[in-house]
Amino acid sequence: MNAPRPHDLLWGMPVSGLPTDAPQWALEVLASGQPVVVRRATCEAGWVAVGLRGHGRAQRLGALMRLTDIQRQQGPEALRVHGQSPWPALQALASVTPVLQARGLAWGPTGGVGYQLATGMEVVHAGSDLDLLLRTPRPLARAQARELLDILDCAPCRIDVQLETPSGAVALREWASFALRVLLKSPHGPRLVSDPWAVMERAP
């Protein structure tokens, strides 16, 4: 099993792994065998930072999971939409799949769309956005980022793409802008950087 990465879904976390003051909905999530999602945070060896997802944005909980409890692991790259859907977010995923495949980079859906595709649970609705992760181990030219964003903005719903670099993640929309510095989400917290692929620079 590979080391868990942000946005991976993990199965196997026991209810006993939750803090004693965890809300009832979180206990029910684990008791029903639902996965948790890997968060971008540092923790002690042998543990991984995860998040639990309930109904709606109000039901979110951060926790820690033992690596030895992981029974199954699935990354966004393994998730694809099959068949037709009435929901714009899933329609958007189907429409942009050829565009992203042509880039030759690893990518996949995260957020509600990824969760639904991985679990079969109906969490996507008419107002859902599409969240995508695009692994970019090498620098992506800002002109290329703008070209890709122009294509994605023609989809039937808003698409938010995170470019996963060796140092962390940056929003495609922000990298495609003309900002001198962009927000890089790293395991050690957010940083403003001029180059997300270079050594992280702390904003003054």
Curated annotation (Swiss-Prot):
GO molecular function: nucleotidyltransferase activity
Annotated S-S bridges: none
Top-level taxon: Bacteria
Alphabetically ordered keywords of this record: Nucleotidyltransferase, Transferase
Catalytic site positions: D129, D131
Summary of the function given for this chain in its UniProt record: Transfers 2'-(5-triphosphoribosyl)-3'-dephosphocoenzyme-A to the apo-[acyl-carrier-protein] of the malonate decarboxylase to yield holo-[acyl-carrier-protein].
NCBIfam families: malonate_mdcG (TIGR03135), PRK01293.1 (NF002332)
Family: Belongs to the MdcG family.
Protein name: Phosphoribosyl-dephospho-CoA transferase
Gene that specifies this protein: mdcG
